[in-house]
C-alpha cells in the first residue's frame, strides 16, 4: 500500500486548556471571485498534543491524521516559534 501525502498546516495556538489537546487557528488569504480582493479567512481546528509541549500563542505545524476523537483529526508535528 502506497503512503499517502498528508496535509500540513501552520497556525497559532489559541487554547491549551484541554488535556493533550490544543486549538489551532489557521489564517488563510482567499481571493473573492467577483471583486478580486483578498480576504482573511480563519478556521479553528483541534489537534492532538501528546507531550503537551505547546503553549498559548505558539506558532505550530500540524499534520492530518486518523480520527482521534469526535472533533480531533490533526496532530502536532513541531513547535515553530515559542510565544514570548
UniProtKB/Swiss-Prot annotation:
Alphabetical keyword list: Ribonucleoprotein, Ribosomal protein, RNA-binding, rRNA-binding
Similarity annotation: Belongs to the universal ribosomal protein uS17 family.
UniProt subunit comment: Part of the 30S ribosomal subunit.
GO cellular component: cytosolic small ribosomal subunit
Gene3D superfamilies: Nucleic acid-binding proteins
CDD domains, sorted: Ribosomal_uS17
GO biological process: translation
Domain of life from the UniProt record: Bacteria
GO MF entries: rRNA binding; structural constituent of ribosome
Name of the protein in its database record: Small ribosomal subunit protein uS17
Function per UniProt: One of the primary rRNA binding proteins, it binds specifically to the 5'-end of 16S ribosomal RNA.
Keyword Translocase: no
UniProt-listed HAMAP family: Ribosomal_uS17_B (MF_01345_B)
Amino acid at each position: 500500500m502506497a503512503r499517502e501525502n498528508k496535509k500540513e498546516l501552520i497556525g497559532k495556538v489559541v487554547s491549551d486548556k484541554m488535556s493533550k489537546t490544543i486549538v489551532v487557528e489557521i489564517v488563510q488569504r482567499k481571493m473573492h471571485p467577483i471583486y478580486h480582493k483578498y480576504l482573511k479567512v480563519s478556521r479553528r481546528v483541534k489537534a492532538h498534543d501528546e507531550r503537551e509541549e505547546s503553549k498559548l500563542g505558539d506558532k505550530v505545524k500540524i499534520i492530518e491524521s486518523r480520527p482521534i476523537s469526535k472533533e480531533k483529526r490533526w496532530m502536532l508535528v513541531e513547535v515553530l516559534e515559542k510565544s514570548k
